Amino acid sequence: MTITIVIFLCIILLYFIIGVFDIQKNIFVESKNSVTKGQICLTFDDGPDKIMTPKILKILNKYNIKGTFFLIGKNIKNNEDLVKKISCEGHSIGSHTFSHEILFPFLSKKKMFTEIKQTNDIIKKITGKKIIHFRPPFGITNINIK
C-alpha cells in the first residue's frame, strides 16, 4: 500500500515538473485577456472566505480598484452574501471549479465540465450574471480544457 502511494505521488510530481519545463505540452491553460499596456489585473483565488474576502473588498473599495475573484463552488455555501457583495461592488467573478480538486488535470472531460458548470450555475443563480472567466486549480489543466 505504501509503495503504491509513493509511486502515485511520484507520477503526479513528474507531471507537474514536465508541465513547468515543457510549456509547449499545453499543460498550463492559456491566458486570454484584453489588458492595455501598463495595466495589471488583480485576481483572488479560493474564496469566498468569511474572513479574507471582506478584508480584500474593503481595501479594493478604499482605493477604487476592481478585481476578479475566482470562487470555489463548495466555498459559496453559507457565503452567498459575499458573492452578491463581490458582484454588486463591480468586481468580476470566475469559476475556480466546485471542489478545487488537486487531481483536476487527471479528471475526465465530463467531470471537468461538471466541476466548472456546477460552480458557474451557483454563481449565476446568486448574481444573475453569466460566468465567462475560469481558472483551473493550481493553474494546471490538460488537453480537454481550452
Located regions from the model:
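Transmembrane alpha-helical segments that form the membrane-embedded catalytic/substrate-channel core
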Residues: C10-D22
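Serine/threonine-rich low-complexity intrinsically disordered regions
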Residues: M1, M52-T53, N144
